[in-house]
C-alpha cells in the first residue's frame, strides 16, 4: 500500500513539473499576475483535454477575410444564409427591435453580424477556446503575446462563472458564442440584456445586445445613417472584425 501511494505521488509530482515547464503556462501565469489562484490555473493546464492543434496555424495562413471579394461573397452572401437571416429576423423581431431601440443600432446590421459570425447559431464551435489560444501560444510566435492575453482573460471568465476550461468551444482564433467574441471583448462588451444576472454567449438576448453594445462603444453613433467607408458605422463594424470584406 505504501509503495502504491509512493508511485502515485511520484507520478503526480512529475506531471506537475511538466506543467511548470509549459511555455504557455508560464506566460499566462505571469500575465495573470496573481489575479487567479495558482491552483486553478495549474488545473486548467493539466486538464486531460488540453491539446495543441497543428491545423490552427494553417487556418490562419488562409483566412476567409483575405479571400477576393468574389470568393468571400460566395461563402457568406448566398440564398440559404439570406433565408436563414429573414427567418431569424421574423422569429426574433420583438427582441431585435428592443435591442436596436436601446442602442440606436440598425437592426439589420445586428442580424447580419449574427449571421456572418455563427450562421444564426449553427456554426460557432470548432475547437475548445482554451486549446485554440494554447495552440497559438505554442505554434505562432507572432500571435503568442496576443493569445497569452486572451487565454488569461478566458481563464478569468471561467473562474468567475465556475466553468470547465475545456467546456466552451469556439473558432480557430479563440472567439466564442453566437457573436464570436474573443475573451477580452466578451468581458469588456458583453451585456446581460435579459437581466437574469449572467452574461451568456449562447443566449440571443445577451448576444444581440452585446453586438449592439460593442458597435456603440466602438464609435457607432446612435441612429446613425452614415454608411460611407469613412463613416462611423463602417469604422465600428471594422472594429468588430478588421477586414474590409467583412464590412462590405
Regions found by a protein language model. Give the residues of each.
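Cell-wall glycan-active module
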Residues: 1, 6, 10, 15-148, ...
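Extracytoplasmic ligand-binding site segments that recognize negatively charged/polar headgroups
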Residues: 170-184
Amino acid at each position: 500500500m505504501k509503495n502504491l501511494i509512493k508511485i502515485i505521488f511520484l507520478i503526480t509530482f512529475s506531471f506537475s513539473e511538466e506543467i511548470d515547464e509549459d511555455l504557455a503556462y508560464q506566460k499566462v501565469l505571469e500575465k495573470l499576475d496573481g489575479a487567479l489562484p495558482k491552483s486553478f490555473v495549474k488545473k486548467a493546464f493539466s486538464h486531460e483535454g488540453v491539446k495543441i492543434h497543428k491545423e490552427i496555424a494553417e487556418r490562419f495562413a488562409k483566412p476567409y477575410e483575405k479571400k477576393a471579394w468574389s470568393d468571400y461573397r460566395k461563402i457568406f452572401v448566398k440564398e440559404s444564409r439570406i433565408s436563414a437571416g429573414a427567418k431569424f429576423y421574423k422569429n426574433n423581431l420583438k427582441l431585435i427591435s428592443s435591442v436596436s431601440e436601446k442602442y440606436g443600432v440598425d437592426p439589420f446590421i445586428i442580424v447580419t453580424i449574427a449571421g456572418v459570425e455563427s450562421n444564426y447559431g449553427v456554426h460557432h464551435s470548432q475547437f475548445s477556446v482554451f486549446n485554440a489560444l494554447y495552440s497559438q501560444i505554442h505554434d505562432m510566435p507572432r500571435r503568442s503575446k496576443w493569445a497569452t492575453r486572451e487565454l488569461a482573460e478566458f481563464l478569468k471568465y471561467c473562474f468567475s462563472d465556475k466553468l470547465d476550461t475545456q467546456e466552451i468551444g469556439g473558432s480557430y482564433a479563440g472567439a466564442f458564442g453566437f457573436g464570436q467574441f474573443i475573451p477580452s471583448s466578451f468581458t469588456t462588451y458583453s451585456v446581460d440584456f435579459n437581466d437574469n444576472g449572467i452574461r451568456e454567449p449562447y443566449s440571443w438576448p445577451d448576444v444581440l445586445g452585446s453586438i449592439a453594445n460593442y458597435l456603440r462603444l466602438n464609435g457607432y453613433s446612435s441612429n446613425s445613417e452614415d454608411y460611407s467607408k469613412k463613416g462611423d458605422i463602417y469604422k465600428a463594424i471594422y472594429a468588430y472584425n478588421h477586414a474590409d470584406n467583412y464590412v462590405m
